[in-house]
Amino acid sequence: HPGSLISDYGGPEAAPVTLETMRILFSRESPSENSQFFSLQMTADGSPGKEVKISNFPHPHPDLKELPKEIIKYKRDDGVELNGTLYTPPGYDAARDGPLPLLMWAYPREFKTKEAASQLRDSPYRFTGIGPSSALVWLARGYAVLDGPALPIIGEGEGVEPNDTYVEQLVAGARAAVNEVVARGVADPERIAVGGHSYGAFMAANLLAHAPDLFACAIARSGAYNRTLTPFGFQAEERTLWEAPETYNAMSPFMNAHKIKKPILLIHGEEDQNSGTHLMQSERFFSALKGNGAEVKLVILPHESHGYRAKESINHMLAETSDWLDAHCAPGAKKAAEARAEEAAKAKRDAEEMVSK
């Protein structure tokens, strides 16, 4: 197709831009090979010439190079098409190895139409990079990971706000995702954890409150749990607390702390500067959960803001998360959790009896 060549090197003495003087710089990657840069010299007839590799970046995690990765597609009970990226440990075979503990790591988003909510945001050909705070770290510990499952909150029509049915849509999306990974034989339904960062942490806490049958535990990092403390809007919510008080309260895990019976790990940076996620959010939520008898742990990372940067903080976060997942998603963890819950309930009853006497 005809096109134009634009150069920032001009002037009366400038040589014309021709194909044979052009060199193209591009990058290439695959699901198992990290991105490398190449140079391609063009020829006068427009055909590509010699390709030269000009970088040789080492693989960032060679032990997890051949990760089984699949973009799975499924439907919510109202017909909305959803998708997510399912990872399993290297060498895993569902028929041979059976179901695994699974970590679902997500971040819900608002949409105005079902079509927009159903769009695919990932590519099966993208390189799988694993950062220090990525959920994919747990593949090395034998967990399956459902990364970024679509949890759309949709508000179609004039005057319809997505968040007015936030809880119902969130639970429907999570249930569809869990049903899919269980039906595939990849996930043990009694050993599924849910987690997220920021608005994903808010999501994880809500799912423990409103869909306790789906998850064994949750990890919530740097979240906001009381929406009355963000009264002038949050995410895509433009209404104020005074314009939509019912929605703000219904969406707040803090207001539903008494419903949370499954274990939840709260992690927060001590100096979180994000406008909606001050440390107070996790501190108050922790107190509410403890007061209602939930199994909860709060980890505060000193000198950290909304994201964690220090090596010590990241290692601490990974260690706490590892211990939490192993305690609640390992074989036999459900019986142990039930025993702990019964012990805590008995201690609470004993304390109440002593007060009444």
Identify what each model region corresponds to:
Residues 1-95, 133-136, 140:
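Non-catalytic accessory segments flanking enzyme active sites
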Residues 34, 97-99, 189, 293:
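Short secondary-structure junction motifs
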Residues 92-94, 112, 273-274:
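Short beta-strands and strand-coil junctions in structured, solvent-facing domains, enriched
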Residues 88, 96-110:
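Short beta-strand element of the alpha/beta-hydrolase
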Residues 119-357:
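Active-site-proximal cap/loop segments of hydrolase catalytic domains
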Residues 68-70, 80, 100, 188, ...:
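Exposed loop/turn and edge beta-strand positions of beta-sandwich/beta-sheet ligand-binding modules
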Residues 110-112, 145:
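Serine-hydrolase catalytic-loop signature spanning alpha/beta hydrolases and amidase-signature enzymes
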Residues 29, 105-109, 198-201, 269:
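Glycine-rich His-Gly loop
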